[in-house]
Amino acid sequence: MTKTLLIALGLLAAPLAATAAPLDSSDQGEYVLLDKDENPTPMQMQFVLQGKQWIMNGREGGGQWQPVCQGTGECRLVASSAGEVSRWKKNLPDSWQPHNFGCINNTAFAFCRVDHASEAGRTGYWWFALTDGRVVPLPVNRLQ
């Protein structure tokens, strides 16, 4: 009985081990999407935490910031579940699997901070397009 309980608890805790702390105010900033060769694209995003709600602005090239997701409707950004994060991570190379992801998402995309599993303070970001049942991961660089 005790062995069965320990196994069950271990299985329940396993998804949590691969999930980072949720995004917080330190993740506010400006980011640029990278292409498949990790070169910057013209698409830039700005994530801002207003109270407990994330909002996103976007711009192309050096243009003006435009509101994209302002915390309402289908564009509202919410904290992602461990199950969602696990599903998105499957689309990344094996080298990313052990790292800890904390994400926000809506119906169209997810934005994730990745904390390195063994090197404290080493952080990266991914953006996942969620379209037509497909998950398309794109790396992101922080600008500010």
Please report, for each region that a protein language model flagged, where it lies by residue.
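Positively charged n-region of N-terminal signal peptides that target proteins for export
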Residues: 1-4
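Bacterial N-terminal signal peptides
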Residues: 6-15
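Boundary at the C-terminal end of the N-terminal hydrophobic targeting segment
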Residues: 18-22
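Short, solvent-exposed loop/hinge segments that bridge or flank secondary-structure elements
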Residues: 23-55, 91-107
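Sequence contexts marking disulfide-bonded cysteines in secreted/extracellular proteins
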Residues: 31, 68-76, 102-104, 111-113
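A structural signal for short, hydrophobic beta-strand segments that form beta-sheets
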Residues: 33, 82, 140-142
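N-terminal glycine/threonine-rich, aromatic-flanked beta-hairpin/loop signature
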Residues: 39-85, 123-133
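Beta-strand-rich cores of mature extracytoplasmic or soluble domains
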Residues: 86-144
